[in-house]
Amino acid sequence: MEFENVIQSVTNSTIYDSFVKAKQVIDTHDCISVSISGGADSDIVLDLIEKVREPGKEIHYVWFNTGLEYQATKDHIKELEEKYGVTIEEHKPIKSIPLSVKEFGVPFLSKYVSEMMERLQAHDFKWEDEPFDVLLQRYPKCKSALKWWCNEHEYTDKIKSYDIGYNKYLKEFILSNPPTFKISNACCDYAKKLVGKKVNTELNVDLNCVGVRKAEGGIRGAKYKTCFESSDDKWDEFRPILWYKDNDKVEYENAYNVDHSRCYTQYGLRRTGCVGCPYNRYFEDELNTIQKYEPKLYTACINIFGKAYDYTRKYKEFYKKMQEKQNKKMS
């Protein structure tokens, strides 16, 4: 389909702008990698790029098979290959998720929370409720994580809103229930992030495309101010649907007949990723879904992430009780 024909009928300004920008960016790069996850956002990215690419353009669609993937996702990857006539290159983790969890710790609540708690644990932090200056004297090489723990980031810092106070009662919970196991976000790094860097280096790409959206929220979306970033020492970064809101997604899907995996259409999941990831705020619902549709994966998730699930449940129960106390005081 000619690009002019693609954009001719587009009435949504966000979608129109994404086509124009994607065409400009793709045309001005020579070797491109595009991350494909089998999720809804990456489905749109793949469709969009296929609509703007010129014949012969070197584009590598890459899928990071973490080892904890729904069969529905694996099937969908094959469906995408057949639909668009492309090859989606599969890449395995540098370290498996079970090995990463065993070596570094389980993920808890969010990537950023896990990273901060991992840093504190690495310095044998005692989960103390002391002022920042006092703690910094005791743990002088852990400044950033201590700022998180003490809610000490400046309001001008882009991560201020993600200090520990962002998760209500989390500090109080940890003080009352210090973790007795290691916490880490390393499984994400070894299953996806570091793999992506390795692949891009080996392919010698000059552009990397990912399907992140600002509307997703969280620190990942908040840190991006533009859909395109150039780099002199590695590859440029492009986020084709960064500005898509949920209604833009739906409009695109309907306009261009974008089909999603059974994870959405049959299982009823809100989003996909590593199966049973403890970062999912609806992990209980997902566990029920896994047990129903892919029971072998359910057993694996319990064995790998069980400590994180239990700790999160305790935190949610603690939160509920603290909120009830606060409500009584206010009534």
Q: Model regions: which residues?
A:
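ATP/NTP-dependent adenylation/nucleotidyl-transfer catalytic domains that generate, transfer
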Residues: 2, 234, 246-331
